[in-house]
From Swiss-Prot:
Family assignment from sequence similarity: Belongs to the class-III pyridoxal-phosphate-dependent aminotransferase family. HemL subfamily.
UniProt subcellular location: Cytoplasm
Organism encoding this protein: Mycobacterium leprae (strain TN)
Assembly description: Homodimer.
Protein name according to UniProt: Glutamate-1-semialdehyde 2,1-aminomutase
InterPro entries in alphabetical order: 4pyrrol_synth_GluAld_NH2Trfase (IPR004639), Aminotrans_3 (IPR005814), Aminotrans_3_PPA_site (IPR049704), PyrdxlP-dep_Trfase (IPR015424), PyrdxlP-dep_Trfase_major (IPR015421), PyrdxlP-dep_Trfase_small (IPR015422)
Gene Ontology CC, one term: cytoplasm
GO molecular function, one term: glutamate-1-semialdehyde 2,1-aminomutase activity
Length: 446
């Protein structure tokens, strides 16, 4: 299958307008970006400045079009500028952007989430995944009266001071152990354990069980690359926390309402005490949520003593985008997402196998990552031990051919339901050259 005329691949000189825009941005924004992974630090080169997105296609400032396999890092399951979402946002925006007062859409979105997630009885809406995580951890400590939190190496839960230790996402991409500015005191009650090692969790609870407020884990990690939990792992976490009176917090910011209509819970129904949501539930707007058992959630102010607040929480425009996205995400959408992921993974694996490059493509539903590795990737250590140095050449070969993959091996690939035959044709054309570039890449010691 070849590319169609309407999907002409980029050609010609370097992305000159993006380069100039990046130069301008660097003069006023640290590093020229507002989230570090966007800077292409892990792959080199100048980040593309995107001016338009429709369906599965991105258009950059130079007018070049790309197949989008990032989907704004996950939220755009329907594709970009989906009419139902655009219409909902336009209608609400015409009536006002923010009121600082309750609106019906907040209740409607909360009810939609609760309807998809059986263990969730109450929802609190916030503005970002980081804010949701910070609030959930505070609530867990307030509810249990304990201080210590267990997190896992390679799992990323936003840029909360206490949870940045050994984190994934941009922290992994930039090879940072944590961050300057995170004090010892802020992280003193954080216990970092290797992911997928349930015995380490048992041993830690045996020593410190009466001090541990909660275990927080990504439902299926996507921030060290996609590294699914071992079978029964989340259920074992549930059993251990329940035995010791600690809470289980499952972070579904990435997986929530993407890998099924009920997120990872729909594939692996482990009833956490608290869940964290973002990305898809906001339809691409800045919104997130945390929710769970009523007994726990009702410790939040104004009902209880655990304080949490936000001027823009429940913003009506963001609520409209999220509600329209979830209502449009029928079962057929999830079937299409799974088919598209199956097709793309098969194409990737065939091209890389034909080229003779070692690779692993671990999956979490319709999310996946590409690691250049002979050995399976099961935790952060094995992700870091992959041939990370092959990825930049692979990435740029795809980008040059008009395919936009994630700009780090430690990030997830995301498909939308809008992927069309022209997009798959573009990918088919691009993959042999990208696989050859990965083979030809040479490791350079730093």
């Amino acid at each position: 299958m070849g590319s169609t005329d309407q999907a002409t691949a980029p050609a010609g000189p370097a992305v000159s307008i993006s380069a100039k825009l990046f130069e301008d941005a660097c003069a006023v924004i640290p590093g020229g970006v507002n989230s570090p992974v966007r800077a292409f630090s892990a792959v080199g080169g100048t980040p593309l400045f995107i001016t338009e997105a429709r369906g599965c296609w991105l258009t950059d400032a130079d007018g070049r079009r790309y197949v989008d396999l990032v989907c704004s890092w996950g939220p755009m399951i329907l594709g970009h500028a989906h009419p139902a979402v655009v219409d909902a946002v336009a209608t609400v925006a015409a009536s006002g952007l923010s009121f600082g007062a309750p609106t019906p859409a907040e209740t409607q979105l909360a009810a939609e989430i609760i309807g998809r997630m059986a263990p969730v009885e109450r929802i609190r809406l916030v503005n970002s995944g980081t804010e949701a995580t910070m609030s959930a951890v505070r609530l867990a400590r307030g509810f249990t009266g304990r201080t210590k939190i267990i997190k896992f190496s390679g799992c990323y839960h936003g840029h909360v001071d206490a949870l940045l230790a050994d984190a994934g996402s941009g922290v992994a991409t930039l090879s940072l152990p944590s961050s300057p500015g995170v004090t010892g005191a802020a992280a003193a009650d954080t216990i970092v354990l290797p992911y997928n090692d349930i015995e380490a969790v048992r041993q830690t609870f045996a020593r410190l069980g009466d001090q541990i407020a909660a275990v927080i884990t990504e439902a299926s990690p996507g921030n060290m690359g996609v590294v699914p939990p071992a079978p029964g792992y989340n259920a074992a976490l549930r059993a251990i926390t329940a035995e010791h009176g600690a809470l289980l917090i499952i972070d579904e910011v990435m997986t929530g309402f993407r890998v099924s209509r009920s997120g990872w819970y729909g594939l692996d129904p482990v009833a956490a005490d608290l869940f964290i949501f973002g990305k898809v539930m906001s339809g691409g707007m800045p919104a997130a949520a945390f929710g769970g058992r009523a007994e726990v959630m009702e410790r939040l102010a104004p009902l209880g003593p655990v304080y949490q607040a936000g001027t823009l929480s429940g913003n009506p425009v963001a609520m409209a985008a999220g509600l329209a996205t979830l209502r449009a995400a029928a079962d057929a959408v999830y079937a299409t997402l799974d088919r598209n992921a199956d097709r793309l993974v098969a194409m990737l694996s065939e091209a890389l196998t034909d080229a003779g490059v070692p690779h692993q493509i671990p999956r979490a539903g319709n999310m996946f990552s590409v690691f250049f590795s002979e050995a399976p990737v099961t935790d952060f250590a094995s992700a870091c031990n992959s041939q990370v140095w092959r990825y930049p050449a692979f990435f740029h070969a795809l980008l040059d051919a008009g395919v936009y993959p994630p700009c780090s091996t430690f990030e997830a690939w995301f498909v939308s339901a809008a992927l069309d035959d022209a997009a798959f044709g573009r990918i088919v054309d691009a993959l042999p050259g990208a696989a050859a570039a990965a083979v030809a890449a040479r490791h350079r010691e730093s």
